[in-house]
Amino acid sequence: MEEKSLLQKLRSYPPAVFFMLGNEFCERFSFYGMKTILFIYLITEHEFSPSKATFIYHLFTCIAYLTPLIGSIMADSVFGRFKVILYGSSIYVVGHVLLSLGAVPFLSYPIRSSLDFSGLFVIAFATGCIKPCVSAFAADQFTEDQKDLRSQFFSFFYFAINGGSLFAIIITPILRGRVQCFGNAHCFPLAFGVPGVLMLLALILFLMGWSMYKKHPPSKENVGSKVVAVIYTSLRKMVGGASRDKPVTHWLDHAAPEHSQKMIDSTRGLLNVAVIFCPLIFFWALFDQQGSTWVLQARRLDGRVGHFSILPEQIHAINPVCVLILVPIFEGWVYPALRKITRVTPLRKMAVGGLLTAFSFAIAGVLQLKVNETMEFPPSLGRIYLQRVGNESLISDFRYKSDGRLIGDGMLPKGRTELDAGIYTFNTGLKNESQEIDISTPNKGYVMAVFRLKDAVEVVKFDYKVEKTDNGATRVFVVTAREDADTLVYAINKKGKILSSCELKSGSYVDVIPGIISDPNVRLYWGPKNSCSGVDCPNTVTLNAQMGAVHVLHIHPSTTEGDFNLLVRPNSVSILWSLPQYIIITLGEVLLSVTGLEFAYSQAAPNMKSVLTAMWLLTVFAGNLIDMMISGTRLIPHPALEFFFYSTLMVIVMGVFILLAMQYTYVEDNDDEITITESEKKDVIALTEIESGTATSDKKE
């Protein structure tokens, strides 16, 4: 028979599945779009500490991977898949609306907080409920004689998953960090609103196929409850002394005669496979930190690559891209080549994958040590940083006012000095009169400048935060003796576009936020606003706008010239140095996560599919629970040490796994073994998403 063309095959598809494809693309965009920027939102808008933001981020993921159990029960026993998707998607939209409203800065914080966290809970609950239903409902639309079409459909289904997540990871950070709204450098209302609109579109697309869908009634059967019943019966009898009265070969055999021997054997096989899922818990604990601790690290990296700039959340896009590239390479070339040299088994692949995941965190730890060298740490408790700028006048007899204690040799040098918070007195050398400076608020940085005027000395000071700028910006403070509200300072790029402006007043500042494509070399102009408006201003100086840096523009009162003083060092470690850890953890995902699920299906009884899926989802839940307990509580205060701890923990877990794997006996091919069709394989992996929209190839091992 002549092979049908792709177009002919597409015409043979049930029309309803095309609505499901659009629905899946939009839903994945909405979920990943929101989740990609969530961690930075918690830090910047709610001003949570990194550990608290990590705790909430992983709590959200925990809920999203625990609620699928509720969704599957409702679909199988109460409503059916169609109604669960319909109701869940409607609630999903409400969650996005709540989160988008909570991002509006005009609202009071209690209102914003209530909207945000109720929205996050609703989204986590809704996405979890529909998670076990969408791909299965799409498969329901095909008849039994359309298995080849169904298998091909899941390739398109994967494209929808990967396309939605990939575009979301790239686009929503741009909406957050490169669009300004409501007077803020970030535009979270837009960044959350666009995924909300996509979820609404997903619901509309789903409704458009209403009349075409095959809606199967709920099966009313829950295998999971039967498994629990078998285990409970066995344990109850063992506690009651049944093992002494009637010896058995396996403790689960105590469940007879209340349960059939087939169910007991299936449960035994399930528990044997369960040990394989143990390393997956720790894998997810490491893997899901790409959205939290690795983003935190990326915020302190230099995102400029030539004239392009990469936002911290966007580097995560390398994961789905690498998966799409690596999986066919491994299936088509790597595994066949290795089979010529050695035996390639699923357990061996999983062991290598786990060790690679551990290695990726070791690399992250080394990178963090390099990042630490560029970090700015706040002053010690009860102390301040005093940054003196300018050379107009020497400062002498610098003393602590309360006890007259001389600081050092009494000469305050140019640059940064760490001091006790308090009030200080000093002489300028121009007149024999004492000056005073109040720097009594602890744990801050202060800028101090002494200007020599005609017959007087002007002392200027202002405070600043001792931390790197957010959003990749370069901040330039102004310090001057000639404060003038009618004179403006402009930051202008090479194209003549005004990037930012402020009044000529000490403590005011301009922020230079890099665009998607931008030149780091900008110029600062200043002059009277009634006679100049940018490049035509008479005074100018060149600035190299490095990400994360904070400068002071010291404007001389007599010459109107300016010079820069560095307050906070720039992000000098390139974000490209994080690529190795992302590529290696993706290799670990391909070898451990994808292989693990396929292996579990090949070793368990056919009636255990739904229970295996539930167990798979629970490994993601448990992994994020570990993140909450360790990273979310700041159990290890230093980020680099924390990365090394996770790496060591994964090595230990994989060591135990390897010892167990050496004793494992594979289930031989027989009639009771699950036959994994490509559509089923993709169906289940699509259900769990492998957190990045992982696709598998069309080859089966």
Swiss-Prot record:
Topological type in the membrane: Multi-pass membrane protein
List, alphabetically, the PROSITE patterns matched. PTR2_1 (PS01022), PTR2_2 (PS01023)
Tell me a Gene Ontology molecular-function term this record carries.
Answer: dipeptide transmembrane transporter activity
Tell me what this protein is called.
Peptide transporter 3
Which residues does the record list as glycosylated?
N391, N432
Family, according to the entry, reads as follows: Belongs to the major facilitator superfamily. Proton-dependent oligopeptide transporter (POT/PTR) (TC 2.A.17) family.
**What the protein does?**
Neuron-specific, H(+)-coupled oligopeptide transporter with broad specificity towards di- and tripeptides in a Na(+) and Cl(-)-independent manner. Shows H(+) channel activity in the absence of peptide substrates.
Subcellular localization, as worded in the UniProt entry: Membrane
Family annotation (NCBIfam families): 2A1704 (TIGR00926)
Organism, scientific name: Caenorhabditis elegans
| SUPFAM superfamilies hit by this protein | MFS general substrate transporter
Q: Which PANTHER family match?
A: OLIGOPEPTIDE TRANSPORTER-RELATED
Chief place where the protein resides: membrane
Q: Which gene encodes it?
A: pept-3
- What does the organism's lineage look like at the top? Eukaryota, Metazoa, Ecdysozoa, Nematoda, Chromadorea
Its Gene Ontology cellular component terms are:
apical plasma membrane; plasma membrane
- Please describe the organ and tissue distribution of this protein's expression: Expressed in the AVA interneuron.
GO process annotations (BP): dipeptide import across plasma membrane; dipeptide transport; protein transport; proton transmembrane transport
Q: List keywords of the entry alphabetically.
A: Glycoprotein, Membrane, Peptide transport, Protein transport, Transmembrane, Transmembrane helix, Transport
Q: Which residues cross the membrane?
A: 29-49, 55-75, 91-111, 119-139, 154-174, 188-208, 269-289, 318-338, 351-371, 575-595, 611-631, 641-661
- Which InterPro entries does the record match to this protein? MFS_trans_sf (IPR036259), Oligopep_transport (IPR004768), POT_fam (IPR000109), PTR2_symporter_CS (IPR018456)
